[in-house]
């Protein structure tokens, strides 16, 4: 009962705060605040530099693979389990999924820099 009450109060509080932020007007939204600032001088170069979408996709792919490989880290401790065939099958399944997803990325040319 206490957990449900705390969860409901936290959810209502979060919703209330989100509604308040959408209803409040943007204070002092004049043009001077949205200009780039370089120590009081005019900017030397444009502040909005274009970002490479290819780099972004490779970085996201790297993060996903890095997190999936982190799932393999507890394997040395899992070797002490009594159900060894299940542990081996689950780790092989994870490695096969990693290999297939890497092959898919490679075939879709998601890892190529030049285009």
UniProtKB/Swiss-Prot annotation:
Membrane-topology descriptor: Multi-pass membrane protein
Location of the protein in the cell: Mitochondrion inner membrane
Name of the featured protein: NADH-ubiquinone oxidoreductase chain 3
Role description: Core subunit of the mitochondrial membrane respiratory chain NADH dehydrogenase (Complex I) which catalyzes electron transfer from NADH through the respiratory chain, using ubiquinone as an electron acceptor. Essential for the catalytic activity of complex I.
Lineage top rank: taxon: Eukaryota
Keyword set includes Translocase: yes
GO terms, molecular function: NADH dehydrogenase (ubiquinone) activity
Disease: Leigh syndrome: An early-onset progressive neurodegenerative disorder characterized by the presence of focal, bilateral lesions in one or more areas of the central nervous system including the brainstem, thalamus, basal ganglia, cerebellum and spinal cord. Clinical features depend on which areas of the central nervous system are involved and include subacute onset of psychomotor retardation, hypotonia, ataxia, weakness, vision loss, eye movement abnormalities, seizures, and dysphagia.
One of the protein's GO biological processes: response to oxidative stress
Entry EC number(s): 7.1.1.2
Gene: MT-ND3
Primary location class: mitochondrion
Any one annotated GO CC term: mitochondrial inner membrane
InterPro entries, sorted: NADH_UbQ/plastoQ_OxRdtase_su3, NDAH_ubi_oxred_su3_sf
Keywords assigned by UniProt, alphabetized: Disease variant, Electron transport, Leigh syndrome, Membrane, Mitochondrion, Mitochondrion inner membrane, NAD, Primary mitochondrial disease, Respiratory chain, Translocase, Transmembrane, Transmembrane helix, Transport, Ubiquinone
Assembly information from the UniProt record: Core subunit of respiratory chain NADH dehydrogenase (Complex I) which is composed of 45 different subunits. Interacts with TMEM186. Interacts with TMEM242.
Enzyme superclass (EC): translocase
Sequence intervals crossing the membrane: 3-23, 55-75, 84-104
Catalytic activities: a ubiquinone + NADH + 5 H(+)(in) = a ubiquinol + NAD(+) + 4 H(+)(out)
Alphabetized Pfam families for the sequence: Oxidored_q4 (PF00507)
